[in-house]
Design a protein with these regions (language model features):
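Active-site scaffold segments
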Residues: 236-241
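Charge-dense polyanion-binding interfaces
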Residues: 262-280
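Residue-level marker of structural boundaries
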Residues: 90, 256-257, 269
Length: 280
């Protein structure tokens, strides 16, 4: 393992995006549990604001199970990050690390809570429809946006009773690619506007929520021993919360979701999806 400062040099940040609070998303690979405990204790002593800390379980979309932890940390401003960067607090032994600078884009809670009022409808469709349909079109072959059948079956058979958090890294196509060549819209319009809104509603109706949504600013600030699955440039991160892991594969039970998949496929270039639980 290597002693690495997991906090980036503030000079690497894009100034126009970081006039106030700075939010970092950090992937870590740590196999020594004692190191993880020490990090958490040190961060607590220094009043570092950890918005979320996730224990990574396994990869749903991607080639390998790799990361052990995922953190979202907020700093008051660039000066606050500068102080922490210069201190020894961030220098830890890690096998791998990847850090992104993100701009939060969370939806208003008032709107989310309004959608939750319609959950009984979602529970009804969940009861009357089978999950088997969701596996029919999955294959054990390479895909940048779908799990393999083996990965999906692992998720369906997951016995954990903890809430499941699905961490998504997203890269969109510049222009959406439909079979109907007369459709000319951007990848963002296809994925976010046409697919994303329906997916969001479906997650909420199935009893879920969204722990975090944000736009990734620039390239990775730190990338050491990162796997091919997460290397490179990403545009957004979304973390969906489900009452149980298998719920991610039951979204098609909600009316309207299946019709939106054509827009997901047209607009999404690459997706990394990781199943995680909350570190408490």
């Amino acid at each position: 393992m290597n002693l690495i400062n997991i906090f980036p040099d503030p000079s690497k940040l894009i100034d126009i995006e970081n006039t106030n609070k700075i939010v970092l998303f950090i992937f870590l690979k740590i196999t020594d549990i004692s190191i993880k405990k020490n990090i958490k204790n040190d961060f607590f002593k220094e009043n570092i604001n950890i918005l979320h800390w996730f224990d990574c379980q396994y990869t749903n979309i991607g080639k390998e199970d790799f990361w052990s932890d995922a953190l979202i940390i907020e700093f008051k401003n660039k000066n606050n990050l500068q102080e922490i960067y210069k201190s020894e607090i961030g220098r830890i032994n890690v096998e791998a690390i990847q850090v992104f600078n993100i701009f939060p884009k969370n939806l208003p809670r008032l709107f989310v809570n309004f959608l939750k009022l319609f959950r009984p409808i979602g529970f009804f469709f969940e009861m009357i429809k089978s999950t088997k349909k969701e596996l029919q079109n999955l294959k054990n072959s390479d895909s940048n946006i779908l799990p393999t059948k083996i990965q999906a079956e692992r998720l369906l058979n997951e016995k954990s009773t903890k809430k499941a958090y699905m961490i998504n890294l997203l890269e969109l196509k510049e222009m959406a690619q439909y079979k109907d060549k007369s459709i000319s819209i951007t990848g963002r319009e296809a994925y976010v506007e046409k697919y994303g809104k329906q997916a969001f509603k479906s997650v909420i109706l199935l009893g879920g929520d969204f722990a975090f949504n944000g736009r990734i600013i620039g390239d990775s600030l730190i990338e050491h021993n990162a796997p091919l699955d997460t290397q490179g440039k990403w545009q957004a991160i979304g973390i969906a919360e489900y009452t149980k892991p298998r719920k991610m594969l039951e979204l098609e039970k909600i009316p309207g979701y299946s019709k939106g998949l054509i827009h997901r496929d047209a607009g999404l270039k690459r997706n990394y999806n990781l199943y995680a639980t909350k570190n408490t």
